[in-house]
Amino acid sequence: EPLCRRQFQQHQHLRACQRYLRRRAQRGGLADEQRGPALRLCCNQLRQVNKPCVCPVLRQAAHQQLYQGQIEGPRQVRRLFRAARNLPNICKIPAVGRCQFTRW
């Protein structure tokens, strides 16, 4: 976990992923977010992370959004974490698939 935390910091706290997750949480639906630049940048950042750290850093990115107070109400929180768990699939990161973490 400390290793993953370090990776999180090295990759600018996955800022692009945080932006993508915030939009997904606030707006729900996929809409154009699936093709947006934030998602592309996010996937690029994610591919640079060691495989065992992919899910832990995504969890950190989701938590960072919570702490920043951008996410309101249980529905947005659920969407935030669902989107975070799905990112390895969306980014087609081999051998990671869907993350298993829950909210905490």
From Swiss-Prot:
It comes from the Eukaryota. Belongs to the 2S seed storage albumins family. One of its GO terms (molecular function) is nutrient reservoir activity. SUPFAM superfamilies: Bifunctional inhibitor/lipid-transfer protein/seed storage 2S albumin. InterPro entries: Bifun_inhib/LTP/seed_sf, Bifunc_inhib/LTP/seed_store, Napin/2SS/CON. This is Sweet protein mabinlin-3. Disulfide bonds join 4-53, 17-42, 43-91, 55-99. Keywords: Disulfide bond, Seed storage protein, Storage protein, Taste-modifying protein. The lineage of its organism: Eukaryota, Viridiplantae, Streptophyta, Embryophyta, Tracheophyta. It comes from Capparis masaikai (Mabinlang).
